[in-house]
């Protein structure tokens, strides 16, 4: 298995790659996550951002496997990225309260040695419990809402908001491991030998 360059500073993606024992190093992308400037469906926008992140790092390293990913939350056709501030986080959590939403991760794998680009996405459906204002404000005060699409961490305290999940759990954490495994196999890279 060749070493992967993760084009992300996300500690959650780092943890997920460590979980499946992949050899990797981290070189974060400098790309601004400005999804509103992109065109297409939410899934296509997530794919485009994952590609931009991978391409940015590929231009720096010029060889090997580069992994880019971008996770967004979609509810009622509205894309929720990372909250800008407490008010933004509050509004996002209020929208998610008692409803089902989509978590979409665009994933891009660039094999620079063989000039192959794989770009895909994974969608997981997450249903939230009803959240009262007190719970939302306490969660925001904890600090966990920040730096995460949709203002919650399903692998943290935010798990108490999740009533149900349809699809890939690791996708809502930030990286769909099953999809990544399939993409690596297309490049003849085996996670399990």
Curated annotation (Swiss-Prot):
One of its GO terms (molecular function) is dTTP diphosphatase activity. GO terms for biological process: nucleotide metabolic process. The record marks 12, 71, 155 as: Important for substrate specificity. It is an enzyme of class 3 (hydrolase). Its EC number is 3.6.1.9. Its cofactor is a divalent metal cation. It is found in: Cytoplasm. Its main location: cytoplasm. It holds the Pfam family Maf. It catalyses: dTTP + H2O = dTMP + diphosphate + H(+); UTP + H2O = UMP + diphosphate + H(+). Keywords: Cytoplasm, Hydrolase, Nucleotide metabolism. The active site is at 70 (proton acceptor). GO terms for cellular component: cytoplasm. Nucleoside triphosphate pyrophosphatase that hydrolyzes dTTP and UTP. May have a dual role in cell division arrest and in preventing the incorporation of modified nucleotides into cellular nucleic acids. Belongs to the Maf family. YhdE subfamily. HAMAP family: Maf. This is dTTP/UTP pyrophosphatase. It comes from Ruminiclostridium cellulolyticum (strain ATCC 35319 / DSM 5812 / JCM 6584 / H10).
